[in-house]
Swiss-Prot record:
<protein>
    <recommendedName>
        <fullName>Long chronological lifespan protein 2</fullName>
    </recommendedName>
</protein>
<keyword id="KW-0732">Signal</keyword>
<dbReference type="InterPro" id="IPR034543">
    <property type="entry name" value="LCL2"/>
</dbReference>
<feature type="signal peptide">
    <location>
        <begin position="1"/>
        <end position="21"/>
    </location>
</feature>
<comment type="similarity">
    <text>Belongs to the LCL2 family.</text>
</comment>
<comment type="function">
    <text>Probable component of the endoplasmic reticulum-associated degradation (ERAD) pathway.</text>
</comment>
<dbReference type="GO" id="GO:0036503">
    <property type="term" value="P:ERAD pathway"/>
</dbReference>
Amino acid sequence: MVRIFTSILLGLLLLVTGTRSQFQFFEQMFGGGQQQQHDSREQNVPSDSDWYQRTYDNARCSNYLCPGTLACVAVPHHCPCQHPAVEDKFELGDGSAICVSKGGFKFGEAARKVELARKGLL
């Protein structure tokens, strides 16, 4: 009787230990629980419009300060694109400019689409 009880107890202990290890494996595999989420949040830049406003207010520019890049230029349509590696800039005839994603277009295709859109054909 004692031998049967010991066998049952040992079986339950092994079952609980195996289940616990399995849950720890899944916890590590899917983000490590709360600690992992906490770490990833610390790496993100907070949404803080006050930071942008302070940086904008402290920027020194005697001409025009571009709001998107904080570049100091002579006139607004000379503002550079925020992401020049992936955007093309198009100066429009009315003194404004737009930045358009290069998005895999062949050379000149983005400019053609901008012109078609300006004419109302796109």
